[in-house]
Amino acid sequence: MNAAQLLGEGFTLMFLGMGFVLGFLCLLILAIKSMSVAVNRFFPEPVAAPKPAATTAAPADDFSRLKPVIAAAIHHHRRLNS
């Protein structure tokens, strides 16, 4: 065998291998998609319940309820670090 024949066989083998890999990957993609369709058909996502209306939040300038919470947090922090 001369160099041209070896090079030709090398290219043939390379393209044959790449073709097998491409075919396998295409089959793998089809299998994954078909499994996804089957799973979604037999086990559909549960319908989400409507969320209850959000409660109205306290106004931003209402610090009368936050002052005792902040004072308690500061007291707790100082007690732990002393």
UniProtKB/Swiss-Prot annotation:
<keyword id="KW-1278">Translocase</keyword>
<protein>
    <recommendedName>
        <fullName>Probable oxaloacetate decarboxylase gamma chain</fullName>
        <ecNumber>7.2.4.2</ecNumber>
    </recommendedName>
</protein>
<comment type="function">
    <text>Catalyzes the decarboxylation of oxaloacetate coupled to Na(+) translocation.</text>
</comment>
<keyword id="KW-0812">Transmembrane</keyword>
<keyword id="KW-0915">Sodium</keyword>
<dbReference type="GO" id="GO:0005886">
    <property type="term" value="C:plasma membrane"/>
</dbReference>
<dbReference type="GO" id="GO:0008948">
    <property type="term" value="F:oxaloacetate decarboxylase activity"/>
</dbReference>
<feature type="transmembrane region" description="Helical">
    <location>
        <begin position="12"/>
        <end position="32"/>
    </location>
</feature>
<keyword id="KW-1003">Cell membrane</keyword>
<dbReference type="GO" id="GO:0036376">
    <property type="term" value="P:sodium ion export across plasma membrane"/>
</dbReference>
<comment type="similarity">
    <text>Belongs to the OadG family.</text>
</comment>
<dbReference type="InterPro" id="IPR023424">
    <property type="entry name" value="OadG"/>
</dbReference>
<dbReference type="GO" id="GO:0015081">
    <property type="term" value="F:sodium ion transmembrane transporter activity"/>
</dbReference>
<comment type="subunit">
    <text>Heterotrimer of an alpha, a beta and a gamma subunit.</text>
</comment>
<dbReference type="InterPro" id="IPR005899">
    <property type="entry name" value="Na_pump_deCOase"/>
</dbReference>
<keyword id="KW-0739">Sodium transport</keyword>
<dbReference type="GO" id="GO:0015451">
    <property type="term" value="F:decarboxylation-driven active transmembrane transporter activity"/>
</dbReference>
<keyword id="KW-0472">Membrane</keyword>
<keyword id="KW-0813">Transport</keyword>
<keyword id="KW-0406">Ion transport</keyword>
<dbReference type="Pfam" id="PF04277">
    <property type="entry name" value="OAD_gamma"/>
</dbReference>
<keyword id="KW-1133">Transmembrane helix</keyword>
